[in-house]
Design a protein with these regions (language model features):
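Aromatic-lined carbohydrate-binding surfaces of glycoside hydrolases
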Residues: 45, 65-191
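Contiguous, structured surface segment used for ligand recognition
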Residues: 1-63
Length: 191
């Protein structure tokens, strides 16, 4: 069981069994009182109430059937990138905080960030911190191993050398090790 919403001695209580349990419980309660997960991203109206009541008893969704549920921001330009540029000054932690909130409200917990011209961990060092604080597990796409964005290699290509493991093993190993070291305190699924 990930979270339980219940009443104890007349008080509404949200109990959790893991890192995201309280968050999911709060967002479930929010949804039940009329706040759409899309309230910010799609300007979905929030239902207003003069009074709210909670029935005595216990409510839970139980454990999710799939452990990692998430999205991949693919082909981010021009749509997503332009929107982020206009709203937040770029694809950065401010933009990702809204994406992460939407994901959590939809009970998602796994994210592959934008990759065309982005370096999630380097463009804004707050991005991985916010992901971790919010309980989002980070991953990378199939061609971005060891938590290294492709653009991280592109920006270092002159110092790293060829993307060829048969001739450049030492430099590529060091590049990958640095990515793992940088992200070791965060919750990641490594490709």
């Amino acid at each position: 069981m990930q979270y339980v919403i219940c009443t104890i001695r007349g008080k509404l209580v949200i109990l959790r069994s893991d890192k995201l349990g309280t968050t999911y419980g709060i967002y479930e309660l929010s949804k039940q009182i009329g706040v759409s997960p899309w309230y910010w991203m799609a300007d979905a109206p929030i239902q207003k109430h003069e009074q709210l009541f909670a029935r005595s008893g216990i409510y839970t969704d139980g454990e999710p059937k799939v452990k990692y549920r998430g999205i991949f921001i693919n082909d981010e330009w021009p749509s997503f990138g332009t929107w982020c540029q206009n709203q937040f000054g770029g694809i950065n932690s401010k933009a990702y905080a809204h994406i992460f909130e939407l994901m959590l409200r939809l009970k998602a917990n796994y994210f592959w960030p934008a990759m065309w011209d982005s370096r999630f961990n380097e463009d804004d060092p707050l991005s991985p911190q916010i992901a971790d604080e919010m309980g989002i597990v980070m991953g990378t796409s199939h061609h971005e191993p060891m938590m290294r964005a492709h653009k991280e290699y592109v920006y270092r290509k002159d110092s790293i050398g060829a993307w060829d493991y048969s001739t450049n093993k030492h430099n590529l190993d060091r590049f990958f090790e640095e990515g793992l070291e940088r992200n070791k305190h965060y919750d990641n699924l490594i490709t």
